[in-house]
Amino acid sequence: MKLCFNEATTLENSNLAKDLEYCEKHGYDYIEIRTMDKLPEYLKDHALSELAEYFQTHHIKPLALNALVFFNNRDEKGHREIIEEFKGMMETCKMLGVKYVVAVPLVTEQKILKEDIKASSVEVLTELSDIAEPYGVKIAVEFVGHPECTVNTFSQAYDIVMTVNRDNVGLVFDSFHFHAMGSSLEDLKKADGKKIFIYHIDDTEDFPIGFLRDEDRVWPGQGAIDLDAHLSTLKDIGFSDVVSVELFRPEYYKLSAEETIRTAKETTVEVVSKYFKI
């Protein structure tokens, strides 16, 4: 299994250039590039071609653009903006050699019926699939374990991607989001491992279902999530591609960028290596 770094882990104590430097130094294979902040910040002082050259001349490679945010159940203007943003991402993927775009469902306090969420998600993902196909890019849908997210359990997200039924549309499996809204391990056991494109590893403090938020995440293996169950099940269903460490903990942002990146690797490898060669 390959090791990836998700830039949320150093959101407030680093930038893309430093993330790349330290991830390369500490032996990461991939990086998920944050398109809402770290990439635009980088492009203020660098050309995209410089980033492409960096990846061509170093071990670390770009795994995903993270993320196309709130893709479903938008009004007409919002939908057009999503499509245009995604088309721009395709050109970035082409230049950098990025394999995936992470797509995050709408977060809202508005109550939307599940059938309407599914219908919109399937329609938009099918449209995105058509756009991505010529580029060879895959779409990884990330359900979010918050009550306000329109797609917040594994079973709901899996049903959507199976209904889309495209080879280039699958899931991000995030241990925090799976745990946070009480997703069922039995549902994961029945899933096709080929429909999981990226595994986000993390852990969390032990708050009740519905109360957990991203800032509650802790180093893998140091919290309440049964990561052994997640990893053993992922192995059983045939997933073995890439693990990406993604934390949002404010106290970790007070560390140096290098210490955060080094500790993220050490804690991830310690947990994952019981089940996968990494």
From Swiss-Prot:
Annotated keywords: Isomerase, Metal-binding
InterPro entries for this protein: IolE/XylAMocC-like, Xyl_isomerase-like_sf, Xyl_isomerase-like_TIM-brl
Reaction(s) catalysed (UniProt annotation): scyllo-inosose = scyllo-inosine
Binding site for a divalent metal cation: 142, 174, 200, 246
Functional summary from the UniProt entry: Involved in the reversible interconverion of 2-keto-myo-inositol (2KMI, inosose or 2,4,6/3,5-pentahydroxycyclohexanone) to 1-keto-D-chiro-inositol (1KDCI or 2,3,5/4,6-pentahydroxycyclohexanone).
Cofactor: binding details: Binds 1 divalent metal cation per subunit.
Protein name: Inosose isomerase
Family: Belongs to the IolI family.
Organism (species): Bacillus licheniformis (strain ATCC 14580 / DSM 13 / JCM 2505 / CCUG 7422 / NBRC 12200 / NCIMB 9375 / NCTC 10341 / NRRL NRS-1264 / Gibson 46)
Pfam families reported for this sequence: AP_endonuc_2
Lyase found in the keyword field: no
Domain of life of the source: Bacteria
Cofactor(s) needed by this chain: a divalent metal cation
EC number: 5.3.99.11
MF terms (GO), sorted A to Z: isomerase activity; metal ion binding
Biological pathway: Polyol metabolism; myo-inositol degradation into acetyl-CoA
High-level lineage: Bacteria, Bacillati, Bacillota, Bacilli, Bacillales
Top-level EC class: isomerase
Disulfide bonds: none
